Structure formats: structure tokens, C-alpha cells
């Protein structure tokens, strides 16, 4: 027994030498009888990674310090000081405070009512206490160089895969009418872009930045699979953006590097002007497509060093993130009619009128970006059905005097190229273009992807533009259900905040880089525990 306790003390001692906790444990290796060989052996243990432990503490920049000067007092004011540690923030949520989900509603960061994002469900990717502090602070996350660089890398990858942004910029540069860019039209554009990207999967073999969403029930604390009632506040919208969808051969073993399979015109017609034709081609190719091909869901992580994260909780959260995406894609593909309704509820939760007309200038901009919807626009103009009953049978709740009319463009547009390509549309339309149209086509597209979804998922790690490592793993529905329920209980106030375990390894790998390190009562209490343990171990050694 004495020998095992001595070994424990030895381990603690070596951590003391390499950490900011050296003032807590104050006995030497000589006192514990540690040999040089034992020191060397302990030093080689995996959790004493020199690259991590010996990294100097990064002091905040002027901008970051200003950010902390605003955030830390705000959190201390809300949570109060810990009675045992004056000056340190309490790690318990005061009883008069709203639950975490209610605290997010109406903030600058979270302006959409009754909504969460996939990343917000990953409450234990780092430390849930830090996550909770940030939620109640209601201050947007500080965007340092790693975050900015990560966004740039995601944009670079998207631009390399899709020409949508380039085509749109080229059209808008010379277009003679102002093209709206408000949040309503941004949503319409993102739905259109996701539709085009998913079709491109079957020609180019990959798609990036594709929208998906699901719903989380408040009372039951679980993900919702069936239909959604629009005015039911118990079902919370959870939105996500899939970094990467990859088409591959089903029977080919998955290696560390999965290359997209370009089918060009083999399944669907490239540069097709009729999305209805694309759907018909996918329908006819269905059995053959499902037998030969599959679609992998993947997430892209950018790193500030050529190394994947070492913390198990971070890796688990990254896997769960991709599992959410995979799950949402499957549910969205189950029933096009239900998905159509879910998309409309999605828009309504964002505060948008699904019957509102999409500005004609925006519609022309979309067609200039990709002609895939051109024939559908003719159908709407002429009052014809698009072949999707929930949309074709729907009625618009608009004024009888409101008409969708592009006639003015005859007098406004002078660009011969635009006139030649789009003048057929410069007249009154029988049916307007609304979010309902894009919801209809997007719902059908999700349905065509569902049978191809692979149970193999992937995380791609990038450093300075180089995909240096991938992790491939299996979809685990049971783990996803358990984790989503645990997260729901946090957000909806059905359990207490659960900080990381108090041990030296966690202090080194988590607390060291936390904004709240200097004022966290949970860590301060952990330091005292370690100090007491060190004293007890020293006494054991002397006895």
C-alpha cells in the first residue's frame, strides 16, 4: 500500500515541476526517494507531452484583454462570488437565473427564437462550466487569429469546390438593379445554394457548406424524428452546416484519404436547366445508385499546429458533431412532405414570412449563378405545377392586389446580355417566387440523398491548407441519443452544470487556456484539493 501511494506521489511531483501548480505541492524528489531513471520514465508518460505541457502560457493581446475586461466582470455579476473563495466566480447557477436556453434568447449572438445550433449542443467538448459562463455572458466569442484563419480556410475550400460565389459576383458586378442582401434573401440564397451543391454531388463528387437542421424536444430532452407542429414551442430548432459531403464507391474500403468520385454526366445531366429532370434521373438510377455508391458526411477542423487534439472530450465532441449532421440528413430525407413543412417552420422560427415575395433581382441573380431552376421559373411565371403537391396545392396569404411582376425591367435593364438571356421573364407572373418554392425543391433533394448516406463518417484536419490527417469512424445512434439528451438537459435546466473533473491533468490541458482560469472557483477549489493531497502524501512518505 505504501509503495503504491509513493508512486502516486512521484507522479504528482513531476507534474509539479512542469506546471503552474508548483506552489501547491512543495516536496522534492529527494524527499520521496525518486531515482533519475524513475524521473525519466515518468517524463515519457503520454500525458506529459512536452509540446503541450511546456508550451508557454499565452498572454492576451490588447484586444483580447479588453474583451476579457468586459466579459469576466459581467459573469461575476451574474453568478456572484463563491462564499468559500472571495473574488472568485461561483460555479453554481443562482436559483433566480433563467435556464441556459432562455438566457440565449434575444441576444446579439442568438436572435432567432426557439433555436440552437449543433455546435451549441457540444457542451462538454471542453469544460461545461466555461460553456455556461459564456452562455450567460451574452458576449460574442472573441475571434482571434485561429478562428479567423479557420473561417478563411473553410471559404477557400468552398470556393475551390463550387463556383457559385464567383458566378454570382460576376453577375452582380454589372447588374443594373440593386440586389437585396438582407437576412430574408440570404436565407433564400442559402437554400438555393444547398440545393445546387447537393445536385453537384452526382457530377463533381463532393459538396461543401450544405445546410441541415433538426428539432430537439424540451420536455422529453430528445431529438425529434416525426412531424413538427409549427406553433409548438416544445420543439426547438437545431441548425447545422455540413462542411463536406463526399460521393464514393460503396464497396471500396475506406482509407485515411477519401477522394471524391466524379461521375460527370453518368447519372445526372451536368449544367441541366431543369431540376425536375435531375430528380427524374436520380429516381430512375435509384437502385443502381444505392448499390454502387454512398455519401460520407465529414467535418473540417483547422489547426494552429500540425497535430490533432489530444483531449478525448474534444475528439468525442468532434465525432458527435458529424453524427448530428448525419442524423439530420437521414431524418430530412425520410418524408419530403414532412421535410417541406419543417423547412417552412425553420424559416418562421427565424422570423420570416414564407409567403413573402423574393425580390426579382435576387431571382435573376440565382439563375445567373446556376441555371438549374430556370424551367421552374417558367412554370411559376405561367402558373404551372412543379410536380410537388404540398407546394402546388398551397395558397398564398397575400393581398389580392399584390402581384409578382418583372415588367419594369424592360425599361430598367439596358445590358444586352441580360436582356437576351432573361427578357422572357420581364412580365407579370401567375405565381410568385417565395421561400415555399425553395423549401419544396430542397425537401425533394434531401429525399434523394438519404438512401446513399454512409455509416462511415470523417473528420478532416487541416494545417496551413494541408489536409494532414483524417479520422474515420462509425455512426453511433445510441451514443448520439445519450449525448443529445444529456445536452438537452443542460440547456433546458433539467440538470446542474457539470464542470471537468478536478485533477492536475485537466488543470494543465483545459484550465490553462481558459478565459476564466484566474477567477474560477472550481479550479481554485481543485488547487486546494491537490495541495491537501500533496501534504497527505508527504506525511505518508515520512511515516
From Swiss-Prot:
Organism classification: Eukaryota, Fungi, Dikarya, Ascomycota, Saccharomycotina
InterPro entries, per the entry: EXOV (IPR019190)
Source species of the chain: Zygosaccharomyces rouxii (strain ATCC 2623 / CBS 732 / NBRC 1130 / NCYC 568 / NRRL Y-229)
Cofactor(s) annotated in UniProt: Mg(2+); [4Fe-4S] cluster
Cofactor note: Binds 1 [4Fe-4S] cluster.
Gene name of this polypeptide: EXO5
Main location: mitochondrion
Alphabetically ordered keywords of this record: 4Fe-4S, DNA-binding, Exonuclease, Hydrolase, Iron, Iron-sulfur, Magnesium, Metal-binding, Mitochondrion, Nuclease, Transit peptide
Transit peptide (first-last residue): 1-39
Subunit comment: Monomer.
GO molecular function, one term: 4 iron, 4 sulfur cluster binding
Family: Belongs to the EXO5 family.
Official protein name in the record: Exonuclease V, mitochondrial
